[in-house]
A protein has these predicted regions:
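Hydrophobic alpha-helical segments
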Residues: 1-67
Length: 67
């Protein structure tokens, strides 16, 4: 697994937990630093929607929105 894939996985795992906006920002930045695009970050979070629900996905996207 590449570092970029690992960071996306961590970001999605944090999104599933809820109330992790303080951690989502730094991991969102790390996603970009290791080579993921903003579109990939958002797509990974949107892919979580059926599993974790809209409120958590929306909160995660808000947390990484300003990156």
């Amino acid at each position: 697994m590449t570092l970029a894939q690992r960071e996306l996985l961590v970001l999605c795992a944090l999104a599933t937990m809820g109330d992790t906006s303080a951690q989502l920002g730094p991991h969102g930045r790390a996603c970009l630093q290791v080579g993921n695009s903003k579109a990939e970050v958002v797509a990974a979070l949107v892919h979580c929607f059926p599993y974790i629900g809209f409120p958590r996905v929306a909160a995660a996207i808000r947390a990484v929105k300003g990156l």
